[in-house]
UniProtKB/Swiss-Prot annotation:
GO biological process, one term: base-excision repair, AP site formation
Catalytic activity: 2'-deoxyribonucleotide-(2'-deoxyribose 5'-phosphate)-2'-deoxyribonucleotide-DNA = a 3'-end 2'-deoxyribonucleotide-(2,3-dehydro-2,3-deoxyribose 5'-phosphate)-DNA + a 5'-end 5'-phospho-2'-deoxyribonucleoside-DNA + H(+)
Pfam family, one: HhH-GPD
Name of the molecule in the record: Endonuclease III
Annotated transmembrane regions: none
Family to which this protein belongs: Belongs to the Nth/MutY family.
Organism expressing this protein natively: Sulfolobus acidocaldarius (strain ATCC 33909 / DSM 639 / JCM 8929 / NBRC 15157 / NCIMB 11770)
Length: 223
């Protein structure tokens, strides 16, 4: 069993995932609305999922329903005020308005070309690799593996891909080893581990279930 599968097994035993802690999965599962999921994921950029969910709910209350048409016709200052709690309101409001101009409702039930849709999404201002990959994996079960700050920190400390692996290197490593369903589960598990145990400051190494695979722990704590 390679290290990726060992990590997956250990983390599945340790954490129980609550979808409400992961805004993109929660919104896609609740609404079955790809456009709403894209907006929710944009709101989560450089923010916590908790704050992003508050902002999303406020935006939904403000415009009535999150659809491209409602967002297109909403005043940008109204959007800024509604999403303020998620931070970077001016930029995110502009991105949200821009997405509404470009995207009509995407149907979850149609077959899509994942790479073509990824190229389409990442060409839109405000949608980078991570945001696109989150939407593709969460809503369409495309075989993508989004990397956020928690996952990057955990993988960097583990060290099996080097001390500063690039987004593409981490993503490709896991994509070659897991199905889309397992990729989504592992994505959530690694984020949960980064939030609760492998924290940016003062990681709780003595409570870590994967410390025996961790270069940071073996080099700095155990010895």
């Amino acid at each position: 069993m390679d290290i990726a599968n060992q990590l997956y097994m250990k983390l599945r035993e340790e954490y129980k995932i609550d979808q409400k802690e992961f805004i993109s999965s929660y919104i896609c599962g609740k609404t079955r609305n790809v456009f709403a999921t894209i907006l929710a994921t944009i709101l989560s950029q450089n923010s916590t999922d908790k704050s992003a969910l508050i902002a999303f709910s406020k935006l939904n209350e403000t415009v009535g329903e999150i659809t491209p048409d409602r967002i297109k016709h909403a005043d940008i200052n109204t959007i800024i005020d509604a999403i303020r709690v998620a931070g970077l309101g001016n930029s995110k409001a502009r991105y949200i308005k821009n997405v509404a101009e470009v995207i009509n409702d995407l149907d979850l039930n149609i077959e899509i070309d994942c790479q073509k849709l990824r190229d389409f999404l990442t060409a839109i201002e405000g949608i980078g690799d991570k945001t696109a990959d989150v939407v593709l994996l969460t809503c369409f079960r495309c075989r993508e593996f989004p990397i956020d700050t928690h996952i990057r920190r955990v993988i960097s400390r583990l060290g099996f891909l080097g001390s500063s692996p690039k987004y593409k290197d981490i993503s490709e490593y896991f994509k070659t080893r897991f199905s889309s369903e397992d990729l989504l589960n592992l994505h959530h598990l690694l984020i949960a581990h980064g939030r609760k145990t492998c924290k940016s400051r003062k990681p709780i190494c003595d409570k870590c279930v994967i410390r025996d695979y961790c270069k940071y722990y073996l080099d700095n704590i155990k010895n």
